[in-house]
């Protein structure tokens, strides 16, 4: 008994020290069903068991107290850091931790306009309630995009739809002090405005609707395609546009071939010329149409072939004078017949086609042609049709070239 009291006194003197020696006393306790079994026997053994149980309870209490002290010490250390961390404190306790001004400080400090803060707070609050919050500061040209100034500039010009229709994005770019060398500045500004500001414009100003915005974007896209098409000259020919009085179908495109059922002038061609009378600047279209031209169309009289065209141009002016006057006002026409070309412009061969149009028996396969209009020289090659001439038109045809056989074969 005295030995146990000495051990107890030694434990109390050590303070928290008895934590280690108390551990070996715990394992032998589980076999005991209850502490009442220790009180059943009367005598020294019962007193010893009761004292050991009391010692164990005291050790547990001391351990709990030590753990509570350690937790209090840990809480006292990060106490200064607690208010600064937004995750450990609810937003309601520290509202300044979650203001838009601190999250988007760069936007609020762009200038000292007193209405800037009010506008940005209202904008961010509206986007938050709408379900599309602004999560980052918009950047353009490596600098912060001023949403306040952009909204004021666009709404001052009538809203986003009006700016798109009038194409005044360059003025908006200058108003934002952005570099003028930005590529596709209009598209970038329109995209940023639609993402951050257009819903707010519809809510506060009601200058347009999403349907009108989509229609303006589609119209702008179609106009861009049309400008790209008209900016490319056909066949690379330079010259002023044709006069309004002339048929627009008389452009540089090749005329359609004549039909087989009509022996007269081609009715499908808007210029009134048969397909074989068109002088093409490139030989490829003629080669493609050789197989589709019937033989009777090759020997048509020039008067029938060129009559409608002479009536269209000017009945009171000669063809040569008309061709000279056509230079400064009309562009060159690939389908112009050779008889309308001014004299002196065909260096290799110059003759009027007063008889039937027949190049098959003349022995000439091609004619080089040069035409100067407004100081620009256009050159091309005319290819002949190599088909046999019908016998019925023999008397009206020019004399055939000498035969390739021996000279004695053509003597009487």
Swiss-Prot record:
One of its GO terms (biological process) is regulation of transcription by RNA polymerase II. Residues 1-23, 78-87 have a biased composition (Low complexity). Residues 50-73 have a biased composition (Acidic residues). One of its GO terms (molecular function) is DNA binding. Residues 113-205 form the ARID domain. Residues 259-272 have a biased composition (Polar residues). Residues 1-96, 232-278, 388-412 are annotated as: Disordered. GO terms for cellular component: cytoplasm; membrane raft; nucleus. It comes from the Eukaryota. It is found in: Nucleus. REKLES domain is required for interaction with NPM1 and nuclear shuttling. Interacts (via REKLES DOMAIN) with NPM1; the interaction mediates ARID3C nuclear shuttling. PANTHER family: AT-RICH INTERACTIVE DOMAIN-CONTAINING PROTEIN 3C, AT-RICH INTERACTIVE DOMAIN-CONTAINING PROTEIN ARID DOMAIN- CONTAINING PROTEIN DEAD RINGER PROTEIN B-CELL REGULATOR OF IGH TRANSCRIPTION BRIGHT. Transcription factor involved in monocyte-to-macrophage differentiation. Forms a complex with NPM1 to translocate to the nucleus, acting as a transcription factor that promotes the expression of the genes involved in macrophage differentiation, such as STAT3, STAT1 and JUNB. This is AT-rich interactive domain-containing protein 3C.
